[in-house]
Amino acid sequence: KPRTSPYSFQGLRAEGLELLAHARSQTGQPIVTELMDSEHIPLFEETGVDMIQIGARNMQNFELLKAVGRTNIPVLLKRGLSATLEELVMSAEYIMAEGNPNVVLCERGIRTFETSMRNTLDISAVPMLKKMTHLPVVIDPSHAAGIAFMVPSLAKAAVAVGADGLMIEVHNDPARAKSDGAQSLTPDQFDDLMATIRPELEFFGKTLN
C-alpha cells in the first residue's frame, strides 16, 4: 500500500496475496486488496482476487484506472484526499469506459484545515453521490478519523445517511500493527459495534452481511 514515508511498512506483495488466498480457503471470505501497479494485474488474476482496491492516492492515476477497467474484477475506488465528488465520479468513469461496470465508490475522509483528526469525513458525500450516479457508496470511518474511539460514531452516522457498506480496520493487537494501528478496532470492539449497528440497519430496512 502507498505510505507517506518510504520507511513505513509497504505490504507483503506476492507473499501477501498467498496469505490472503489461504485465509479465503479457510474462511470463505472474499479477497479485497490494493493494486499499486498495472504490472501486478496478472498476479491478481492468477490469485483470483475478488475485488481490487484503488487507494486515495491513486484515484487519478488514469492509466491504472484504465488498466483495471480492462479486467472483469470489481473495483473499490477510494476518494482522493482533496478530490471533489465530480472528480471521483469521473475516475469511476475511466474504469467503466474500458468495459468494467463493477465499481464501488468509497468516501474515506478528505483533508481540511482541522488538525485534531487524521481527515474529515464528508458524510454529505453519500446522498450526493447517490444522486449523481447509480454506483454503490461505502464509507471508511477508520481512515476518516484516524482515531479508533471515533470509528463507532462515524460508522453509525454512515448507516444513518444511507451508505451501502462500511470498511473498518480491525487488528488483534493495534499497538503492534504494521500500519493504521491508531485507527484499528480490536475484534471485541468490532463485535460490539456490529451488535449496536444491527438494530439501526433493521430500522432502515437493511441487513448486516
Residue positions per predicted region:
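Catalytic cores of alpha/beta
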Residues: 38-47, 85-91, 146-164, 172
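Active-site/ligand-binding-proximal alpha/beta "capping" segment
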Residues: 96-161
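Glycine-rich phosphate-binding active-site loops on the catalytic face of alpha/beta enzymes
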Residues: 55-62, 160-183
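Glycine-rich, proline-tolerant flexible connector loops at the mouths of alpha/beta enzymes
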Residues: 1-14, 171-184
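Conserved anion-binding
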Residues: 2-3, 56-124
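Glycine-enriched alpha-helix->loop->beta-strand junction motifs that scaffold or abut catalytic
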Residues: 43-52, 67-75, 96-102, 133-136, ...
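Conserved, mostly hydrophobic/aromatic
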Residues: 44, 77, 129, 140, ...
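C-terminal helical cap(s) of enzyme catalytic domains, especially alpha/beta-barrels
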Residues: 172-206
